[in-house]
Amino acid sequence: MGARIAVIGAGHVGLVMAAGLAELGHDVTAVDVNDALIVGLRKARVPFHEAGLVKLVEQGLASGQLHFTNTYDEAIPEADFIFLAVDTPPTLAGAADLRNIRNATRSIAGTLNGKAPIIINKSTSPIGTGRRPSSSAVLMRNRPRMVVSRSDWSFTVLANAR
């Protein structure tokens, strides 16, 4: 059996990642605040074109490896890994608007129940976002943690350091 994975955001990045991880044998739950999107995804209705994605979603649903919810409580408490794949639209000044990342980290922190999963940020965000208090302090409060950050396009990881 694979890892238990939560993917926060079921848009272009999150949905493709969730379906791919489910195909690899992981138990994946994708969370999105868009209720209509979740209702559609539970019926394998993918709202954008990505070659082969509908088939992957159908297979994931049929195998029981892929789940969709609008509730963090259904995805976070048992997750070994959490991928953040939320929208970060540009502000009027052109910088990334990190409100969705902040909101997601607060929601994650509220459902961790003492567990300390590895959290990977796949959202488009400036270098060092994982080190900023607005992004990581809520998750790191009263928990020994280490922040590992890559300065290239890959990802930022907030992880255990026990």
Model-derived segments and spans:
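Low-acidity, Ser/Thr- and Arg-rich intrinsically disordered low-complexity segments
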Residues: 131-136, 141-145, 149-155, 159-162
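N-terminal glycine-rich phosphate-binding loop for ADP-containing cofactors
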Residues: 8, 20, 65, 75, ...
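NAD(P)+-binding Rossmann beta1-loop-alpha1 motif at the extreme N-terminus of oxidoreductases
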Residues: 1-45
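A structured beta-alpha segment of the ubiquitous adenosine-cofactor-binding alpha/beta core
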Residues: 53-80, 90, 109-113
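Short, well-ordered coil/turn residues at beta-beta hairpins
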Residues: 78, 84-86, 122
